Each structure stands twice: as C-alpha cells, then as structure tokens.
Amino acid sequence: VIMPDLRAHGLSDKPHDPVHYPKDILADDQFALIDHLGLSDFDLGGYSLGGRTVARMLAKGCRPRRVVISGMGLEGLSDTGKRAGHFRHVLENLGQHERGSPAFMAEAFLKTTGGDPVALLRILDTFVDTPIEVLRTFDLPIGVICGDDDTDNGSASALARTLPKGRLIGVPGNHMSAVIKAELGMAIRDFLLEEGI
C-alpha cells in the first residue's frame, strides 16, 4: 500500500507561490509518482480530496484495475466550487467561526493536522470539475465508499448511480468520523480483494 501525502498536506511540500498550484496538479503529482515507481498494474483509491484526485486521474486517462472513491459524492466532483467556497471561507476567517459550526470543525481539524492555511488556499485554486458526462465514461469497477451520514461532498449514491460500474458501499459515520473507523478500511479491503468484478 502506497499512501502519499498530497501537495500541501502532511509531509509533502507546502509552497506558497501560486506558480506551484496549476489546475489539476494533484492528479499530475500522482501520475508522476506512478511513473517514478514504474507501476503498471495497480488499484487506486482516495478519501475526500484524495477521491477527487482519483476522479481527475481517471478523467485524464488513468486506468487502474479497480478504484475506490471514498468520502465523496456526485456534486463534490461535478461542481467543486461549492466545497472550495466552504474551505476558502474557513481558511480566510480563522479564529472567527461559531463553535460547533461546520467551519469551526474544519478549522479544528486543520489545527490538529498542522495544515498551512496559505498552501491550502492555493490547493483550492487547483480544483477542476469533472462533468457528469465524463464520469459516465469511467467504465471500470469503482467502489463509492462513504459514511452513511456523510453528505459533505454531495450524494454518494448519486455518484455510484452515475458510474457505469459504480457500487455504493456504506460505512458508519459522517465525513469526519468515518475516516477513523475500522469499517472504512475493511470495506476498502473487501472491495479491492473481491473476486469476479
């Protein structure tokens, strides 16, 4: 299992200069990693922004054996502006969000992960919508694995219905809680190891 930190996340570089954040750079970074590692037969998956990155890779021609798009719904891929707007509001108003609000919770998460607000704002400028007609061309097995109470990025069931071989797999939790539950990892494992798909 290879789990890279996306640009501006985790241990990856967090440059501030906008020149380092062209459209679709997160997908392009992953193509470069695949090329660097010489991978030719692989599965591909991602959670939330990682799921959006996977969709962009598919839109740009990547064809892994199987795919997991997790923590993501149809609107989070086809209309990225809404989610980008939410995070732009969070990042541009740090310390000013009402306690318990979605923006407050997002800011708290950023603090616990050591997120760099300037670099993360730049990431929002890299987002590219994946139109529904493009999603309908993703003709390979795709597990849409999402928390049963997660609507942060739109409808996971609508996404699964849009994909020719999409399958909705629900796990307990919402966008922030599902990612830390064992059920998510088990659902990903089971989908990738399932025979006959």
Spell out what each predicted region is.
Residues 146-174:
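Conserved loop-alpha-helix segment in the C-terminal half of the alpha/beta-hydrolase fold
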